[in-house]
Regions:
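Aromatic-residue-lined binding/catalytic grooves and analogous aromatic/hydrophobic interfacial grooves
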Residues: 16-446, 461-465, 482, 496, ...
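Hydrophobic, well-ordered secondary-structure elements that form the walls
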Residues: 346, 457, 481, 534, ...
Length: 669
């Protein structure tokens, strides 16, 4: 969960620590990865790989950022608008069960969900070496150098490997070497679980070619994405030849593997793209390519350093493998250097998974070994996509933020149609998840009827402007902010008790509540998070309009709506900030989402000094969640750290960071 460590940036990055000798920014281990969750990631924003470091047969699991199942289509439901008013009426009348049944039948998109981001395939490289016979084994990820290394001794020879993903050259590069001449022997093949074939071309090119098998009902041919991967084997000394679907390198001093991959997502020819990339890289010196790659990466990575006083001597930390350090923290050790490594690993992952011109980091960043990934490895816009980018500005990686804005622009057209067809509203809308095909309709179930995704995403526009002061950027992206606000102005409706403006239907992401009659429901009106996101968006729109000197009449409408918006509620029974406009009981008091605290972080409507009563109520809500087991997922615990940072409770922030490391962090961090 290091990708979501903006919490550390909020809490630790602003401190003034006692500077010691530099923390070694290396993850390292004494054994190969036993499974995917122990492999080490590399990426250039578009291509990613998980390197296992296996001795006898290395596995390199590959990804290309645009390789998804599915195809672009209109997923709106033409029946939705006709039933919206009835759903709203039933919710206002407290007949939530009837409203839920009607909403589930008519308000969801068609189809109801997205398909999965997919693995490109696996590269297998056999060495013939016996794992049991090797000595002095080490594998490592050098964060500052953005390179994975594997080394070991066998029979008097030292074998070394290096792997990196170059953004300047657009390829993944692997090098196998030995200190004794003629000792590098490799058998190289590439596989994919479905929808592809592999073959060789010439003596040294291995090709994986395929098309995702996506056949809607009644359609005979696949509409799925075409993709290709080329592996070029270049030995130094020795020879290389093709045998069936395998390349064999024999008696080489070293061997270079250049990997390129592409899809037709942007209507380009993936074969041509792969040939261009491999042919260009083939003409370059390996060490020059590595130097250019590292200079490009360090231009971003070295902008931020972090040092925390550590009771463990530097030499001891350097000589202890990362998994052992993590195990020690689980057993109660205090190792602030591991927090530094974790923080910088988060920055490494964002640089590796999100570069200008590419797609944004998805639910798993860039790395996924499945054909059908958990939660489709999609773009969850009810926190996860946003959380990926919380570190972007505060850790000085503004360029890595840009793919998110490009992606948002690609959603606007679909979001406008969804707003019109489903709600009869102007502007644009996104619900709780999306994909690379522009999916914006409600998905999965009634919990997907959460039309706040576009509004929350727009917070990132203002964040980027606030850090950069780039007025041209704001001019380009302000229409997205205005469009999201226009949708909400049309969508808001007066509730019957006080005449406050509220959202309806409304949902607090993935959570439910118990009504006075004992019925458990998810749909309501005016969920607290909705109100907080609206306040955030409208406020930022007003500020943007002041900066740009535009839309004074629209600004007045926003101010009027803010004045009528339902206020945040503090429970008279518990003193906690209510998650819903009514003081409902929570069936799952330790729920992983803490959506009603959005105004504390990443929003800033609630502050210790500006709104002390709301801040105290938010603290009680946070304490209540934690007392009932909240924070049991890694991303949730990272959010909790951010809450404590905003509440200026450094001790609690630190304790929750230790809990994140101890309970929710895998050996590869």
């Amino acid at each position: 969960m290091a990708l979501s460590m903006a919490a550390l940036a909020s809490n630790l990055g602003s401190a003034s620590p006692i500077v010691q000798r530099a923390e070694p920014l290396v993850l390292w281990y004494r054994a190969p990865a036993s499974d995917w969750n122990e492999a080490l990631p590399i990426g250039n924003g578009r291509l990613g790989a998980m390197v296992f470091g296996r001795v006898g047969e290395e596995r390199i699991q590959l990804n290309e950022h645009s390789l998804w199942d599915g195809h672009r289509q209109d997923t709106t439901n033409p029946q939705a608008l006709a039933h919206l008013a009835e759903v709203r009426r039933l919710i206002f009348e407290g007949r939530n069960g009837e409203a839920t049944a009607l909403a589930d039948r008519y308000l969801l998109g068609n189809p109801r969900g997205v398909k999965s981001y997919q693995s490109l395939g696996d590269l297998w490289i056999s060495t013939g070496h016996d794992q049991q016979a090797v000595e002095d084994y080490r594998r490592e990820l050098d964060l500052d150098g953005a390179i994975v290394r594997t080394s070991y001794r066998l029979g008097g020879a030292r074998f070394t490997r290096e792997a990196f993903a170059s953004a300047p050259d657009g390829v993944i590069v692997l090098r196998f070497a030995c200190n004794l001449r003629g000792k590098v022997n490799l058998r190289i093949r590439i596989t994919r679980a479905q929808d592809a074939t592999s073959f060789t071309e010439g003596n040294n090119r291995l090709i994986l070619r395929g098309q995702v098998d996506d056949r809607p009902p009644g359609v005979q041919r696949s509409l799925g994405m075409r993709f290709e991967c080329h592996v070029l084997a270049i030995p130094s000394g020795g020879s290389v030849e093709a045998k069936g679907d395998t390349l064999e390198v024999q008696n080489a001093n070293s061997a270079l593997l250049i990997i390129a991959a592409a899809t037709d997502y942007r209507k380009e020819n993936p074969e041509l793209l792969c040939r261009r990339a491999t042919d260009a890289a083939e003409r370059k010196d390996y060490f020059r390519m590595k130097d250019v790659h590292q200079a490009d990466f360090r231009r971003l990575f070295r902008r931020v350093s972090l040092s925390i006083t550590n009771p463990i001597p530097l030499e001891q930390r350097t000589l202890t493998p990362t998994d052992r350090r993590l195990e020690a923290v689980r057993n109660g050790a205090n190792d602030p250097g591991l927090a530094v490594l974790y923080f910088q690993f988060g920055r490494y992952l964002l640089i590796s998974s999100s570069r200008p011109g590419g797609l944004p980091a998805n639910l798993q960043g860039l790395w996924n070994e499945h054909m059908h990934a958990p939660w489709n490895s999609d773009y969850h816009t009810n926190i996860n996509l946003q959380m990926n980018y919380w570190p972007a500005e505060v850790t000085n990686l503004a360029e890595c933020h840009l793919p998110l804005f490009d992606y948002m622009e690609g959603l606007v057209s679909s979001g406008e149609r969804t707003a019109k067809v489903h709600y009869g509203c102007r502007g644009w809308v996104v619900h709780h998840l999306s994909d690379v095909w522009g999916f914006t309709t409600p998905a999965d179930g009634v919990w997907g009827i959460w039309p706040m995704g576009a509004a929350w995403l727009c917070q990132h526009i203002w964040e980027h402007y606030a850090f950069s002061g780039d007025k041209r950027f704001l001019q380009r992206t302000y229409p997205m902010m205005k469009g999201a606000a226009l949708f909400l102005l049309d969508f808001l409706i007066p509730e019957p008790k006080h005449g406050w403006l509220v959202t309806n239907p409304s949902h607090s992401p993935e959570n439910s509540f118990r009504m006075p009659n004992g019925q458990v429901s998810q749909l309501t009106y005016g969920a607290t998070m909705d109100l907080e996101i609206i306040h955030d968006l409208f406020t930022h729109c007003i500020q943007a309009e002041d900066v740009l000197g535009v839309d004074r009449e629209f600004q007045k409408r926003l101010r009027d709506a803010l004045g009528k918006l339902a206020p945040l509620q503090i429970s008279p029974k518990t003193g906690r900030l209510q998650e819903w406009i009514e003081d409902y009981e929570e069936p799952e008091p330790g729920h992983r989402h803490m959506s009603h605290l959005f105004a504390l972080h990443p929003g800033n409507e609630i502050t210790l000094r500006g709104t002390p009563q709301l801040a105290a109520a938010a603290r009680k809500s946070l304490e209540y969640r934690l007392a009932h087991g909240g924070g049991h997922t890694g991303w949730s615990r990272a959010w909790i750290i951010s809450f404590w940072a905003r509440l200026e409770d450094g001790e609690q922030a630190w304790q929750n960071l230790q809990a994140l490391l101890a309970r929710s962090t895998l050996p590869n961090l």
